[in-house]
Amino acid sequence: MTLLLGSIVELLGGDLQGDASLKIEGLAPLESATPQQLSFLSHPKYQNQLAASRAACVIVSPEMRGVALARGACIVTEQPYLYFARVTQLWKKSLPRTVRPQIHPSAVIDPEAFVHPRACIGALCVIESGASVGADTVLKSRVTVGENCVIGERCLLHSGVVIGADGFGFAPHAGAWEKIEQLGAVRIGNDVEIGANTCIDRGALQDTVIEDGVKLDNLIQIGHNVHVGKHTAMAGCAGVAGSATIGAHCTLGGGAIVLGHLTLADGVNISAATVVTRSLRKPGHYTGMFPIDDNAAWEKNAASLKQLHSLRDRIRALEDKLMTLRDRP
């Protein structure tokens, strides 16, 4: 498949510097792009790769215009990364499509479930009683939507997603565990994307809620009664424990953990591998991981960290003693 460079700019905008009739045969990163492929530069720190790239054309910001022109054709736009995202959408729409049934013959759909006629249900999916799947939503293979769970419009659920498994609720009794029945469901808004093998548990009494525009990567665990605000994004292996509330426009890096019953304000960004142990009431970027080091140095630092409390008390005692000496005539 090919697209003319001029056609891309005509559809998506941007300032083209180069031959509009140039044929683009693919999309690729700067370092591996060929003279028939389109690439992009999202950050100035990669400008050395830009100068060395063999790409037919590169999408750049106005600040990188000069560097890009020195090597060849470019499309200048205020947001290169966003522009490239839209190029990928355009490219996918242009690919030849195989006509498939809206509901795969192997899918199991309860008679009491509702699937919109424009929804697409993949192989071996299971949609249980009372569940609802909205218009233009796509469920890839082996997705399970539990009883009474609701999925909105234009959502994309990748293979192996489980919506509405029981939340993890047990009451201790006589040295054993008594199950707390999970009587809520899961409500997912519109334009949500959920990565492969991610699990969203149903609420215990109230619903677990995923608002519009949320993006979840692969292998994420969302516990029961969690509420995730609009347009929040989480990278792979993140986990949110039960009854936590995540605000709108938040991000969680890969492997980040939010403990149960905590609240994150709108606009909170959590670095990868951070464990959030308290509520964060103000927007901002938060990091809680211990820096990596060679093992011997790490053990020394960890040992010192365990002594910080006693070291603080000793320093305070020394400061008090110095103040006493300073006050003497």
Swiss-Prot record:
Pfam family of the protein (one): LpxD
Gene Ontology CC: membrane
Q: Is the keyword Lipid biosynthesis assigned to this protein?
A: yes
| Active site location | 224
What is catalysed by this protein? a UDP-3-O-[(3R)-3-hydroxyacyl]-alpha-D-glucosamine + a (3R)-hydroxyacyl-[ACP] = a UDP-2-N,3-O-bis[(3R)-3-hydroxyacyl]-alpha-D-glucosamine + holo-[ACP] + H(+)
Instruction: Enumerate the InterPro entries for this protein.
Output: Hexapep, LpxD, Trimer_LpxA-like_sf, UDP_GlcNAc_AcTrfase_non-rep
Q: In which pathway does it act?
A: Bacterial outer membrane biogenesis; LPS lipid A biosynthesis
- Entry's Gene Ontology BP terms: lipid A biosynthetic process
Could you state a single Gene Ontology molecular function term?
Answer: N-acyltransferase activity
Q: Which UniProt keywords apply?
A: Acyltransferase, Lipid A biosynthesis, Lipid biosynthesis, Lipid metabolism, Repeat, Transferase
Q: What class of enzyme is it?
A: transferase
EC number from the UniProt entry: 2.3.1.191
The entry's family comment says: Belongs to the transferase hexapeptide repeat family. LpxD subfamily.
Description of how the protein assembles with itself and partners: Homotrimer.
Q: What function does this protein fulfil?
A: Catalyzes the N-acylation of UDP-3-O-acylglucosamine using 3-hydroxyacyl-ACP as the acyl donor. Is involved in the biosynthesis of lipid A, a phosphorylated glycolipid that anchors the lipopolysaccharide to the outer membrane of the cell.
Recorded protein name is UDP-3-O-acylglucosamine N-acyltransferase
Upper lineage is:
Bacteria, Pseudomonadati, Pseudomonadota, Betaproteobacteria, Burkholderiales
